[in-house]
Amino acid sequence: MNSPSIHTIAPQNEQALLQRAQSLAGYNLAELADIALLPLPANLKRDKGWIGILLERFLGASAGSKPEQDFPEIGVELKTIPIDEQGKPLETTFVCVAPLTGNSGVTWESSHVRHKLARVLWIPVEGSRHIPLGERRIGTPLIWSPNDEEEEQLRCDWEELMDLIVLGRVESITARHGEVLQLRPKAANSRALTEAIGEFGQPILTLPRGFYLKKTFTAPLLARHFMQLSN
């Protein structure tokens, strides 16, 4: 098994990416931070994206914060997912920022959500709060695409949520909307407002929103993966 090393060049194919990710499995965050010369924060309250930034150094991600996938050369998105001792996800998974204006004629097929979730490298990371950040270990990665059933679930939720946005009802959307995909505010502070459409078609200011995968979607996805590993 390869030991972790920093990669500044993007992987040429999925197999190369998966090998890089597999080389991280079993290492804890402090060990990887030492190799990457990246300071380990006390916690993730102010550094929510820190684990992703750390892992990108070992994987050779090139997209940064652009709207395209993390590995645009091979069409793969990176998602880290905190898990408990049973391998179950501890929180929802951010997909992308939701467009609140200019949505006439937008379709699921051309949406950012579908583009981001077309091919995903999932990297589980221990996330239980009683484990100090530096001692949390990286799990075995998987590369995934939604099957027909998952794609249909995502499409139905996306269409329902986008209909509400277009109809000027963005502020009536709660985290309970959607079976597997939810829309909720994404802002570090409540002063970061963005333009949206109001109930009567008028421009309004509201908090930016993001699409998130619910745990009811990611839990069975991970369960299948861990089951395959144990067989």
UniProtKB/Swiss-Prot annotation:
Protein location: Cytoplasm
Keywords attached to this entry: Cytoplasm, DNA damage, DNA repair, Endonuclease, Hydrolase, Nuclease
GO cellular component terms, A-Z: cytoplasm
Domain of life of the organism encoding this protein: Bacteria
Main location: cytoplasm
InterPro entries: DNA_mismatch_repair_MutH, DNA_rep_MutH/RE_typeII_Sau3AI, DNA_rep_MutH/T2_RE_sf, Restrct_endonuc-II-like
GO molecular function, one term: endonuclease activity
Gene Ontology biological process: DNA modification; mismatch repair
Family designation: Belongs to the MutH family.
Task of the protein: Sequence-specific endonuclease that cleaves unmethylated GATC sequences. It is involved in DNA mismatch repair.
Listed name of the protein: DNA mismatch repair protein MutH
